[in-house]
A protein has these predicted regions:
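Substrate-binding pocket helix/loop in short-chain dehydrogenase/reductase
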Residues: 57-59, 63-71, 175
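C-terminal helical subdomain
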Residues: 142, 165-205, 212-214
Length: 220
């Protein structure tokens, strides 16, 4: 759906470029950057926002494939993209990298251990990158979205409802109540934070973990 919107956008082929690849496949990411290098010699920003919810269940009921798939998508993909983007951002004499974590990356998250572990890893890598890349004027920050209303949360609520054998409505209310503001987060909320962090207004902000979550106070 998103790519269709991009292709129909009046700026497509002028300022917008769309490309489909499996972010968890190193060869496909490499091919993506080959296409980027044909179009430009430098970039100013990278936003790593790919991620999956992972399985729902207690740890003794999960298997290694559950963990591997979650980490490959949520963490290793960030490595693939960041490694190839850094030289292009250096050529720009600085820029911004935004990595997406979650409230689960700063708190525990019952029944979602692979997801929580992967999101904590994103925070650790980002903090380290901020230290390594600061001398190149490259800022690295983390966004931790709250409960975003959309297709992904529909699947998460469905899976948790099935596992706990309770109604979807009950699970939905529980997710909303995790934030002190008792609200959903919307895609535009996240987009606005991204726009700020890649702008010159955030020129001195790096190494930060920023929640856009209505003040999430628990994950349970």
């Amino acid at each position: 759906k998103f790519l269709k919107k991009v292709k129909k956008h009046p700026l497509n082929n002028k300022k917008l470029f769309s490309y489909i690849c499996d972010a968890s496949n190193e060869d496909e990411v490499s091919n993506f950057f080959k296409q980027i290098n044909k179009k430009t010699k430098k970039i100013d920003s990278l936003i790593n926002n790919v991620g999956i919810a992972g399985p729902t269940g207690t740890i003794e009921k999960l298997n290694s494939k559950d963990w591997e798939k979650t980490f490959k998508t949520n963490v290793i993909s960030h490595f693939y993209f960041t490694k190839l983007a850094i030289p292009l951002i250096k050529k720009n004499k600085g820029g911004s990298i935004i990595n997406f974590s979650s409230g689960a990356g700063i708190m525990g998250f019952p029944l979602r251990s692979p997801y929580a572990a992967s999101k904590w890893a994103v925070v650790g890598v980002s903090k380290t990158l901020a230290m390594e890349l600061g001398k190149f004027k490259i800022r690295v920050n983390v966004i931790c979205p709250g409960t975003i209303k959309g297709d992904r949360m529909v699947r998460v609520i469905r899976d948790k409802s099935k596992f706990l054998k309770v109604s979807k409505k009950k699970i939905e209310k529980e997710f909303i109540s995790m934030a002190s503001m008792n609200c959903w987060i919307f895609e535009d909320d996240i987009g606005k934070m991204c726009s700020f962090l890649i702008s010159d207004e955030a020129a001195r902000i790096s190494g930060q973990v920023i929640g856009v979550d209505g003040n999430a106070i628990r994950l349970d």
